[in-house]
Amino acid sequence: MPGSELSVLFKGRNFLRLLGGLGVTLELSAVSIALSIVLGLLLGVVMMLRNPVTRALSRLWLETIRIVPQLVLLFVVYFGLARAFDIQLSGEAAAVIVFTFWGAGEMGDLVRGALTSISAHQRESAAALGLSRAQAFRYVLLPQTVRRLIPQAINLATRMVKTTPLVMLIGVVEVLKVSGQIIDAARYDAPQAAVWIYGVVFVMYFLVCWPVSLLAGRLEKRWM
């Protein structure tokens, strides 16, 4: 009966465990997103430099995150680099490193795109008004860049949240891992519980990401 299958979710501490797993997901996402924003802003400015070395390195960074799947990066960091250099690295730390590496690269490209989308005549106008390059960047380029960047950055943040289930494969006990443990424990008593439990996980992700996506859409319509 559906009622008995669904009751597995509220048996013992199952629902609290699921909420705890969601908390791990959100914590990993929040830390990775915050670090990605800071590093991505710096990387975006570096991408605009005319130095061929920095351009080549930033291009290599960007191509790496675009070509190599995030799961492969997780395995390389957690199983490869940590053991090769004899580093005690938790799954959570490996996840933050990989997601920050990925997010910063994507954010840097967004910053570069936002900066290059500003017409050259605005820089020329700022120079004609006697503004230095630093003043032109602060008062003319930066406000417009932020406006164009925020909706895209929010979309990137939702993508990072939706990618976090991959970390269960390196031992991180997040919401999807917890749901699998609950389903395995109830396999004989409630064999159809997976439908309901994964349905609840679906609702959790929807409630987290949908408002953020709506906000990004509204900001994009207003500012773009």
Model-based region annotation:
Residues M1-M224:
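Transmembrane alpha-helices and adjacent helix-loop boundaries
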